[in-house]
Structures are given as structure tokens and as C-alpha cells.
Amino acid sequence: MKLARFSFEGKAEVYNGVIEGDFIHTYSGSPFEQIEILQEKYALHEVKLLSPIIPRHIIGIGKNFVAEGSIKPPMPELPIFFYKPLTTVIGPDDPILFPSNVTEAKFEAEVAIVIGKTAQAITPDEASNYILGSTIANDVGAFQFFHEEGHWTVGKAFDTFCPLGPYIDTEFDYNNARIIARLNGKELQNSTMEQIITPIHEMISYISGFMTLMPGDVILTGTPAGADFMRAGDTIECIVDGLGTLSNTVQQR
């Protein structure tokens, strides 16, 4: 099932929907409990897709991919995690806004995992039971604010620095998913989730050991080699086979 949030005809009202083919059907209820698909539907080309979720928390993992053909190192005892506030979240086609003190930032195409139910100190074997689904993320970072000893949050926390979308797929198999990123049409990232160092089930278990994960929380699972800098006027497309394309342009605020 492909879950989305959308608006229609420029109205402020936000609808929840299930995408089926070229249409999106509205639904009632909560994706974390039970939904009922309603008769009302819209053509996809008539609506504006929004971020498919407004998470309470966004947790990212850094340095979690190896280049294809490289020897994969063992999973680190202490993975690099960072935090993004919900004010970083935007949806498909929304602008990434650089504040006056940022002139360039890196894009990072990633698979994002959406948590489906409260998870506290769960085991890796239990992790799949706590996943609602997957979506695409662009984990934007202003590297000039990264601390040399690994403090990343400041550079990751600017408003609009976490595009998500276009939808959450509740049945997506992320294990071998291919991740691609194009900057102004030029392909700069192309790899698969097979190159991940800390597996997703281990990631979820580890995080749930030091903080309770809530329904709707988002985990950014890392990005392959090739991430590069983008500047005002650029367009970045993050593509995951089976999850669609997340496209955003960059503007100077």
C-alpha cells in the first residue's frame, strides 16, 4: 500500500490518501491503526503531494555505506547518529531554502524507514514488526557547520533540510533497493542497499535501546558514495527503484 498526504487546488486542507495507479483515494482512520478507503478519489496529476509523514523525531546514521566492490567493514560498536528536527521536513517539489550563512550544502539520497508502532529496547529480530514502511529522503547537510570531532546536528538541522516523499510504501523490500541521485540531470549517486554497513534491523534495535521510537518517527539509513554540493538554482532528484522520485530545487532564502 502506498500512503500519501496531499492537497488539492491550492487549498490549505490536507488529505490522507492511498495511491493506486494514476489515482489517489482518500481514507479515514490512522495508518498506525486501521484505515478505511473512501470513494472519493483524485487523479494524481491534479494534486500536490506533500511530505507523506510529519515525524516526531528524525534520526540519521552517518558513514553507513561502502563503495561497490569495496570490502565491507564490521558493524561499528557505536554507529554515528545525528538528529534532525521536524522543521527540516518538506515534501516533493518544495524548495530547499539556504539561509544567508549557507551558500552550498550536500545532498544525500537515502531510503527512510517510517516507524509504525512504539518501539522500546527491541531486538534486531523484532525490528521488522515495528516498521510502517519506507520512503525516500534527501538528507541535506551544510558541512561548514560539521564539528571536526563528529558533531553533525547543527549542519543537518536547518529548516527544509529533509525532503521526504513521494509516499510511504508499506510493502517495499529495501534490502536490495537501488539508490540514485541526479544533480541538474547528471547522475552522481548510484548504488544499492547491499552496500550498507549497519543493517536496518540492527539500526532500529540500537536506537530503541537509548530512545523510545514512536509511530511516525523516521530513520535515515545512510547514503552511498557520490553525494555532492548543490547551490541555489540547482535541482536534485533522489530516486529509489520501487519508491519513485523525490525532486526539489534549491533557493537562497
What is each of the regions a protein language model found here?
Residues 1-79, 172, 182, 186-187, ...:
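N-terminal non-catalytic cap/leader segment that marks the start of a structured domain
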Residues 48, 52, 68, 74, ...:
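Catalytic-pocket segment enriched in acidic/His residues
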Residues 54, 60, 91, 106-108, ...:
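Residue-level recognition of short, solvent-exposed, well-ordered loop/turn junctions
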Residues 75-92, 107, 237-241:
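Structural signature of FAD isoalloxazine-binding scaffolds in flavoprotein oxidoreductases
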Residues 84, 109-111, 115-117, 135-140, ...:
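Short, structured patches in soluble enzyme cores that scaffold and shape functional sites
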Residues 92-112:
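A structural-propensity feature for long, helix-poor, extended segments
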Residues 120-136:
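N-terminal accessory regions of nucleic-acid-interacting proteins
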